[in-house]
Design a protein with these regions (language model features):
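Domain-level signal for soluble alpha/beta catalytic cores
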Residues: 1-373
């Protein structure tokens, strides 16, 4: 029996964890043809089983597979759709100080969501649920998938598979709804959309580099909102769908900067998720004022503990920031988490596993002091 409450939790996490050395080695061996898929899966299963035990020992109410079966947080999920495959990217994504490997996702047929591998991945984690934990399935948001597949003109020839972006978007929505229906049937009650599309619209330098005018930015906000809400529409009442709004997280570097104000009205006011996991770990994140736009009884998880650096934050400083956020949204609707995952890609951030768990212990300790739970 799973935990009787669902996310977000007062002490929470985004979901990805540093890959153990044994898993990294196995993935390299698989890529080199030294081991087969079954051997890789055996290593993954062992690593995930051990990770779940560590999450429980840390007192977390949410368990994930750490994204241990993925090299990328987003592409690896997209590649699981029918009609989407791996491709070499024409350009590497430039994070600050580093560039990513040259991977992307490309359309190779009509997109659909039947028989995705991630449902079996979820079932493996689901078996470890108990009276204190809920299994979470993370995935790139529908807007993220749409951005990747429409952002590269070579990604899909209109005349071969789709006449226009609207046709492609309709199939993305249908594919997500199929996957979520299958996850729900497998017992999933906590889905998390990870999304870097909104924060690109918050960064003037990114908008300039991509050639987006102010009108383009407003149009893209509406397109993001429409595709996400179309997937969420009419989902079961006991299925919690939250979103992590990310500024990029590759090897302790970042992709975009800027507060949430430019997108707050649409993102916080109109996106029909249950909660937002938001990054507030440094000066690039802006202030808390945009939280006043969070509508209804939606909750906000404050990502005040950075997952990019090993140094532990001062608890009193974090508590003061929580109280500052509570000026814009009631304290009872706030929670605390790490700012992002610890390994959005298999490279992982620049800290050790011990430092990773120390960060989570800090989240737990502060949450208990603030909310008593």
């Amino acid at each position: 029996m799973a935990y009787s409450h669902n996310a977000p939790f007062r002490a929470d996490v985004v979901g990805s964890y540093l890959r153990p050395a044994e898993l990294k080695a196995a993935r390299e061996d698989f890529a080199a043809g030294k081991i087969d898929a079954a051997a890789l899966k055996a290593v993954e299963d062992k690593a995930i089983t051990e990770l779940v035990a560590k999450q429980k020992a840390a007192g977390l109410h949410v368990i994930t597979d750490g994204e241990f079966r993925r090299g990328w947080w987003h592409f690896a999920f997209m590649w699981g759709f029918n009609g989407v495959d791996h491709a070499a990217a024409a350009h590497r994504v430039a994070f600050h100080d580093e560039v990513t490997p040259a991977d992307t996702a490309t359309v190779t047929g009509r997109i659909s969501g039947e028989n995705p591998p991630f449902v079996e991945h979820f079932k493996f984690v689901k078996q470890f649920e108990d009276e204190n934990t809920v299994a979470r399935q993370t995935m790139p948001s529908p807007a993220q998938t749409r951005f990747v597949l429409t952002g590269n003109a070579a990604a899909y020839p209109y005349d071969e598979f789709y006449k226009n972006d609207d046709e492609l978007t309709a199939d993305i929505v249908a594919a997500y709804r199929q996957v979520i229906a299958d996850l729900y049937a497998a017992g999933c009650r906590n889905v998390q959309f990870d999304d870097c599309t909104w924060t690109r619209l918050c960064d003037a330098s990114v908008r300039e580099r991509l050639g987006w005018s102010d009108e383009d930015a407003l149009r893209l906000q509406q397109e993001n909102l429409d595709v996400i809400n179309a997937v969420i529409a009419d989902q079961p009442d006991d299925l919690v769908i939250n979103t992590h709004v990310c500024r990029g997280n590759f090897h302790s570097t970042w992709l975009s900067s800027g507060g949430y104000a430019p997108v707050a009205a649409k993102l916080f006011g109109e996106e029909n998720v249950d909660a937002y996991y938001l990054e507030f770990d440094d000066d690039r994140s802006g202030d808390f004022a945009p939280l006043a736009e969070v509508s209804g009884d939606k909750k906000v998880v404050l990502g005040l503990i950075t997952s990019k650096k090993p140094d532990l934050e001062d608890p009193d400083t974090i508590k003061a920031r929580i109280q500052e956020a509570a000026q814009y949204i009631p304290l009872d609707r706030l929670c605390l988490s790490t700012q992002c995952g610890f390994a959005s890609t298999q490279e992982g951030n620049k800290l050790t596993e011990d430092q990773q768990w120390a960060k989570i212990a800090l989240v737990q300790s502060i949450a208990k002091d603030v909310w008593g739970e």
